[in-house]
Amino acid sequence: MLTKRIIACLDVTGGRVVKGVNFVGLRDAGDPVAVAARYNAQGADELAFLDITATSDERDLILPIIEAVASQVFIPLTVGGGVRTQADVRRLLNAGADKVSFNSAAIADPQVIDTASAKYGAQCIVVAIDARRRSAEESRRITAGGRAIGPGWDVYSHGGRRNTGLDALAWAVEMQRRGAGEILLTSMDRDGTRIGFDLELTRAVSDAVGLPVIASGGVGTLDHLADGIQTGGADAVLAASIFHYGEYTVGQAKQHLAGRGIAVRR
């Protein structure tokens, strides 16, 4: 039986780990190197390092911090935020990343996923999708086919600041076609709220693609992690708040998932 993964997430800005609610109201959560080492020791299956303001600030990759984090962890490390080109993938892999996550750059130029995947392999290429449920007004938006787009989720770029108008399910399918190896799916509506994943969104994307889907956004209890897998169909679950402030350890999370009948790496 394939085990399900628990991924600890470091949202980084200004050289510090932070956590907000709905992508705003950021609260400090510590030094990224120290936090990464803690999750490595706790037995996290993977670590995600996301520079959440690199794109909006038009800033370069923070390679020294990434290298320092990579030196402290012996689990797969995914790095995202400010990744724009195939050359950036090479720079991050050389800095110690195992996978590289594209978001806004893939929206601006989807071909970058084709080229990066062809050169480095799909197993290295993650596409992050920040999705927000459409309002009633947005659901009436007319598509190129002349019909209302209807209920669903729009894809946002630039750290959740811009609505691209792309449909999240269609975008995930296109990213799979272009060579992505994994989808990191964040519900902007649930981010930091601690009320659980958007399970409808998670299930819809999981059913739409044949790729591993990482559920992100909204974890407040250990049951939420299990729900993301059992109800949402996710292959991995990502959390930040419940781990950052000492409420739970990764080990406790794995024990809880096992108690719910979910296979985890111990």
Curated annotation (Swiss-Prot):
It comes from the Bacteria. One of its GO terms (molecular function) is lyase activity. It is an enzyme of class 4 (lyase). It is found in: Cytoplasm. GO terms for cellular component: cytoplasm. GO terms for biological process: L-histidine biosynthetic process. Belongs to the HisA/HisF family. This is Imidazole glycerol phosphate synthase subunit HisF. The gene is hisF.
